[in-house]
Amino acid sequence: LFEGMHRENSYHGDAERFGIASAILLGDLALVWADRALVESGITQSEFIHCQTIFCEMRDELMAGQYLDVLEGALGTSSVERSRKVARYKSGKYSIERPLLFGASLAGAERLNQTYSSFGLPLGEAFQLRDDVLGIFGDPSVTGKPAGDDLREGKRTVLAAMAMEHTDAAGKALLDRSLGNPDLSEKDVAALQEIIISSGALEQVEKLITELTTSAISALRDPQLDGKIAKVLEEMAIIATQRSV
């Protein structure tokens, strides 16, 4: 957006550098707005103190996850465990676990923190794994993104890491030189999809999603948790992991 604005208006200097700098500043501004929204939310000072701690931890974890994601791409290597760590920090914690803990704090229900963590962490990871599958095998007419977008972007996902581990030498070489190539054709993407399927990686990831979802739902059996809340959270878990978009 900012880079395009620079080019369209013939601004001085480098358009790409302007775009990157402007995007970073916009991200900084969004963090300021998030703080302001919390301060102006109407919660009490005591509630604010408790929530602010969770809020800061959530942002720390998110930034760490984003950095690890960038680092994986720069290293150009694949590791299932490292990719899973990225999934946990980049998505699992901030998208599900921390918001639940945030709500528990506001409701004075910190006694449920362990239950919410036991539910949120595996579900958050499963949510990211489903996103990874859709990023390679998703239907463009449903997702709104070209098939194989994650391959073109060179994302070192758990799915890609598992494929690298279990495919043969030729498949590994093709994956290695193809990941991050923005010019991959539909035919190229189809060839990479076949490698991922034949290596067993897709089946393994689907199995892992099921295991993580089952683990998350089992945490909802806590007798301290209201049955209606447990039902809503279970439905959310199914929607989050069985989605097609």
Model-derived segments and spans:
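All-alpha prenyltransferase/terpene-synthase fold signal
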Residues: L1-V245
